[in-house]
Amino acid sequence: MFHPHAGAITVRVGGSELPVFFVPSGLADYSYAISLAQQIRVSCPIHVLPWSAIGDPLPHSIEDMAERMIPLIQAIQPEGPYRIAGYSSGGILAYTIAHALICKEESVEFLGFIDVPAPHDLLYKNKDIKHYFIEHVKAVVSESECHKFDILNKGDELAVLIKKAQKLGGYDLNVDISLETVKWQAIYHFSQIAGAYEPLPLPIKLSYFYAAEREPSHLPQIDMVGGWRELLPDLEICSVSIPGRHVSMMENVSNRKHLAEAFDRALL
C-alpha cells in the first residue's frame, strides 16, 4: 500500500497511447489499478502514484499531497496532455492533481472517477481515528456479522482495537500491528485533508463511473455523482453506470470487465 521509493510504480509498459496515472484509494490501496489494468484494452502504459513511505511526514493539505505527486508524473511524462484516475475517496486526490496541473498551464485530457464521494460526503470525517477505524471494520463484514464488532471500544488504543478486530475475524491476522497503526494514522489523516478540500470547477470533462447497486442497509447511502453535481454544478460530468456496489464493482471480475470496457470507451 505504501511505497518506500520516491517514484511512480509501473503497472503496465508499452502502448501507442498516452499513459494513465492512477492514485491509491482512500485506504492507500492501489491493488485495484493492477487488477483493472489487466482488463483495459486501450494500448497505453499504466502507472500508480503511491503515497509516501510509512513514517514520512504527512502532507499539510491535499493540495500539498498533489504537488508531491506531480514530479512523479512528469518524471515519466514531462508534458501533457495527462490522464489521471482514482477510485473511492482517492479520486479527490486525482481531482486535486488535475487542478494543480491545469494551474501550471498543463493540459489534462482525461480525469476518471470510480465511485468517488464528494469531499463533503466523506464518511466519518468528523470522527476521531478510533471511531473511523471501527466503522471501516464494520463496513467490510457482512450485515449479519456486523453486530459482533459492537464490542470494539473507542476508549481502547488503536493497536488494541486492531488486535480485537483480528480476534473477531474482521482483520488480517498476518500483519505487523505497529505498522498497521502507522498506516491507519496516514489513512485517517488523508480522510481529514480530503474532506477539507474545496474543489473549484475545472475546464475539462469528468468521466464518472459509478456503482449501479445500493449499499447494504447497515451502511450509509450516498449519492456519489449527485454530490459532485451539487458541489460543482458547472462541471461537465459524463456518468456511466457499472454493475455492482462500491466494492464489488471492482472486486467482481465480471463487473470489473464492464468497468474496463467503459474506461476504454472514455479513453478513446
For every predicted segment, state its role.
Residues 1-268:
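A hydrolase-biased, glycine/serine/histidine/acidic-enriched motif that marks catalytic-domain neighborhoods
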